Amino acid sequence: MNRRRLLVSATLLSYLLYGMALVSVEASGGEKLRDNLDLTKTTTSSPSISHRKMLLLSPGTGKTERSVEPERIGEKCKSTDIVVNQAVTEPMPNGIPGYMVEITNQCMSGCIISRIHINCGWFSSAKLINPRVFKRIHYDDCLVNNGKPLPFGSTLSFHYANTFPYHLSVAFVTCA
């Protein structure tokens, strides 16, 4: 019964937060923002720029402009090639919420990225995480895969448990 009550409470809370987000976007006068708002996606560190260069029409002028290409970290790599996704999972038996994190090398040109550092605040977990997979070195600095390369197309994942999710984003990487 407790699990069911927790599920119902979490569902109601998510609808309440979604409604509050829509109200705040509406209050800020951003109808264009509301069209782009999608709260069903998982957290990601990469912007929504595609890997192809697209020509966009400037509003009002009708002239074309190029989209901004992500900053490159090597001949083959872009800073957005490492993507961090996070999703809610089943809570631990003691009720602490659980989260799954996936860190993926999405480089399309076959680059191998190493020394992946993640902005992670005071990251901690009630569930043990293999420190060779993910560990906090200092405040807001977590190391992925013990600094070893993450080959292109590879995904590294781990689970953690805490009363709230941490905002995880790529701080810096090295491209080989």
Swiss-Prot record:
* Phenotype on disruption: Male-sterile phenotype due to the absence of tapetum. Presence of extra microsporocytes in the developing anthers. No effect on cell wall degradation during microsporocyte formation.
Q: Which Gene Ontology BP terms does the record give?
A: anther development; cell fate determination
> Which residues belong to the signal peptide in this entry?
1-21
What name appears for this protein in its UniProt entry?
Protein TAPETUM DETERMINANT 1
Keyword Transmembrane helix in annotation: no
Known tissue expression? Expressed in leaves, young seedlings, inflorescence meristems, floral meristems, carpel primordia and ovule primordia.
| Stated role | Involved in cell specification during anther and pollen development. Required for the differentiation, specialization and persistence of tapetal cells in the anthers. May serve as an extracellular ligand for the EMS1 receptor kinase to signal cell fate determination during plant sexual reproduction.
Q: How does it assemble?
A: Interacts with EMS1.
**Entry keywords, A to Z:** Differentiation, Signal
Q: Mind telling me which InterPro entries this protein's record contains?
A: TPD1
Instruction: Extract the Pfam families matched here.
Output: TPD1_C
**Transport as a keyword?**
no
Top-rank taxon of the source lineage equals Eukaryota
